[in-house]
Structures are given as C-alpha cells and as structure tokens.
C-alpha cells in the first residue's frame, strides 16, 4: 500500500499555531489535542494515528511535515508501530521529510517500532532547518516480540537520519548523519558495543540553531546528571559538533525509554 501524510502549520491572528494544510491517505490520520501546560506557549499539540494493524510487505509510507515561521508543533503517535512478517524478498519502506522555517520548533516522538519475525523495514528521514529553528526528534526500536521469544528474528532493519541547516546562499550544511543497519543473519548484534543483552534502542536528537556550543554543553551536563538517576538503562549523551546533542539509550522496556525521552523533551523545551 502507498500511503502519504502531509501537514503544515501557520500562525493564527492571535499568535497560536494551527494546522495550515493537512492531507492523509489511509491508514494515516492526525488529530489536534487540547493545549496542555507546555513551555512552548504558542504551540500546537497533535497526534499521528494509524488504522492499520502494522506495516505490511510492500508498504511505501511517506510523511511530509512543514512548519511555518514562528510556529511550534508537538507531534506524538497513538501506539506502537508493528512491522509484520514478510515473505523472503519482500520489504517495506518509510520516508520522512521535515522542513523547519525560521524560528519554528518541532517535538516529534513516534512510539516504538517493533520488528516482527521475518520483517524487512527501511526508513529514511531528511530534516532541513532554517535560522533559529529548534528540533527534538526521537526514534525507538525493539528487536522483536521478546515475550514471544523473538529476538533478532527479523531479516533487516535500516534507519538513515540526515539533518541540514539551510543557508542564505541556498546551500545546505550537514549537521547530523546517523545510520543504523541491522542484518541479524550477518551480524553479531548481541556483541559488546552492539545491543548486548538489551532489547530496545532509542535515540533522541536535539538541535537549536539559536544556541552556541557553551549553552549546549550546559544542557549536556544537566542531562548527564539527570540520567545518572535512571535505573536499568544504558545512557550516552554526546554534544554534536554544533548546535545540539544526541542521546542514545539501550534498555529492556520500550515504555521506560519513551518516558525518558518525554521527560528530556520537557526539559529541553523549557531552557
């Protein structure tokens, strides 16, 4: 199935973020949520939903998100995304393109991805950021249905994330390039420095083009102190070359990583 979700934002006359354009093909759907107590006072809260039991063989999923100048969007998902079993030679793919205009802010944290036995899933995410924009973007993936004794029973998983800063001359400067490639039949993914005995991996990328390296360093140190209190998680927090940081987490419970990223998101929104 070919499915597409496209949405953009605009600023209302009273300075609040609204949906400007919205288009969704089944199984995608987006609903707006009430405004909660959020550090992004003018922001819009929304939920990305799906009526499908999961990602199936042959699925081509496309997500396009565009934020207008001065708008802020917090986008979550309804439930876990399950990549269902596939015949040999079949696969599914998702491409995501995000464009952040000047002084816009996006928090995007999809629920964890669960890789079922014999599944093949490839995803590519491209994010382009204009001046003074801010991004909090997370990904969480489970190695299988562990309670069903499925551990690394999928065939392949790949995730490519590329983030660029837009420049006045029309060129793009690379900020982040991150690649995960899992081939269980060819890789020892339980080895040291790989997944070891953990079953879930999460990564959270934070970029704020209005902050300098000294300010980012303070945020890294604050998060490192906070993460020391977390139990049963292996957490690494690194400062990027410029404008941001990345959090990488290994754990055994998806909900624990999800709650950690939500907590970090609230902290980053408030500084």
From Swiss-Prot:
InterPro entries: UreD. One of its GO terms (molecular function) is nickel cation binding. It comes from the Bacteria. One of its GO terms (cellular component) is cytoplasm. It holds the Pfam family UreD. The keyword Hydrolase does not apply. Its main location: cytoplasm. Keywords: Chaperone, Cytoplasm, Nickel insertion. It is found in: Cytoplasm. Belongs to the UreD family. PANTHER family: UREASE ACCESSORY PROTEIN D. Required for maturation of urease via the functional incorporation of the urease nickel metallocenter. UreD, UreF and UreG form a complex that acts as a GTP-hydrolysis-dependent molecular chaperone, activating the urease apoprotein by helping to assemble the nickel containing metallocenter of UreC. The UreE protein probably delivers the nickel. This is Urease accessory protein UreD. It comes from Haemophilus influenzae (strain PittGG).
């Amino acid at each position: 199935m070919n499915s597409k979700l496209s949405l953009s934002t605009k600023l209302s006359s009273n300075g609040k973020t609204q949906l400007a354009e919205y288009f969704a093909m089944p199984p995608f759907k987006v609903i707006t949520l009430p405004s909660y107590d959020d550090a992004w006072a003018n922001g819009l809260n929304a939920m990305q939903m799906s009526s499908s039991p999961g990602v199936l063989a042959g699925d081509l999923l496309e997500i396009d998100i565009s934020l207008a100048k001065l708008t802020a969007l917090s986008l979550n998902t309804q439930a876990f995304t399950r990549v269902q079993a596939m015949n040999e030679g079949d696969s599914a793919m998702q491409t995501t393109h995000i464009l952040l205009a000047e002084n816009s802010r996006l928090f995007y944290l999809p629920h964890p991805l669960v890789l079922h036995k014999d599944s093949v899933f490839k995803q590519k995410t491209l994010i382009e950021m204009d001046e003074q924009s801010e991004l909090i973007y997370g990904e969480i993936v489970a190695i299988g249905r562990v309670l069903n004794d499925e551990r690394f029973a999928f065939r392949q998983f790949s995730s490519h994330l590329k983030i660029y800063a837009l420049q006045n001359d029309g060129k793009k400067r690379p900020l982040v390039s991150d690649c995960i490639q899992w081939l269980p039949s060819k890789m020892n993914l339980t080895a040291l420095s790989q997944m070891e005995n953990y079953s879930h991996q999460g990564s959270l990328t934070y970029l704020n083009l209005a902050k300098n390296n000294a300010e980012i360093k303070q945020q890294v140190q604050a998060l490192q102190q906070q993460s020391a209190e977390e139990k049963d998680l292996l957490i690494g927090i690194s400062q990027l070359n410029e404008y941001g940081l990345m959090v990488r987490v290994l754990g055994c419970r998806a909900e624990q990583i999800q709650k950690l990223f939500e907590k970090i998101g609230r902290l980053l929104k408030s500084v």
